[in-house]
């Protein structure tokens, strides 16, 4: 995957909050947090460079880019974190002002006809059949029309975390995504 575009933008958007959360959650001083962030950037670029390009219709590219950033920071820390503090670190680092705006905006369309159509397209795409760092999912629409469930059968985050030797920390990403979703829905 090319660094320019979304990966570079995500680094610009989130690296400062990642650095701040190194201090808040893990107790690193400002110099150590700066050192970790400085070491994480070339690692992040390397991780991104080793990922294949995502298809234009693949809606999960951002998830993989964010996972790459978290992995780069973890691999740059002097001590491997535990899942629980890493969960808080990632959730807090991702919940920036622009992300809160994005959550409010996207939350207004959840379960709409347009959202459901996009989910059907995602299910049909089966992008992980061609890219091991993407996702495949099965969509289960509720018979009463009240919503749906997406059950993932292939997980790009799991694949990348295994590659990075961080698979045991994968629950931190999923738990933090749930925390972020709750924060987003409570602010909508």
Positions of predicted regions on the chain:
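N-terminal accessory segment detector
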Residues: 1-147, 156-174
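C-terminal, beta-strand-rich globular interaction domains
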Residues: 169-173, 183-188
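Active-site-proximal segments of catalytic enzyme domains
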Residues: 178-180
């Amino acid at each position: 995957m090319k660094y320019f575009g979304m990966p570079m933008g995500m680094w610009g958007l989130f690296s400062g909050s990642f650095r701040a959360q190194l201090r808040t959650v893990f107790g690193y001083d400002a110099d150590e947090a700066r050192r970790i962030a400085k070491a994480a950037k070339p690692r992040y670029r390397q991780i991104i460079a080793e990922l294949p390009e995502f298809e234009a219709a693949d809606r999960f590219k951002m998830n993989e880019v964010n996972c790459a950033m978290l992995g780069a920071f973890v691999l740059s820390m002097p001590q491997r974190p535990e899942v629980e503090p890493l969960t808080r670190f990632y959730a807090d680092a991702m919940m920036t002002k622009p992300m809160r705006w994005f959550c409010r905006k996207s939350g207004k369309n959840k379960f709409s006809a347009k959202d459901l159509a996009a989910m059907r397209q995602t299910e049909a795409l089966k992008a992980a059949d061609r890219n091991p760092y993407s996702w495949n999912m099965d969509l289960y629409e509720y018979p009463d029309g009240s919503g749906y469930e997406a059950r993932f059968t292939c997980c790009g985050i799991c694949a990348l975390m295994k590659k990075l030797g961080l698979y045991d920390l994968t629950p931190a990403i999923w738990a933090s995504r749930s925390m972020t979703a709750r924060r987003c829905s409570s602010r909508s």
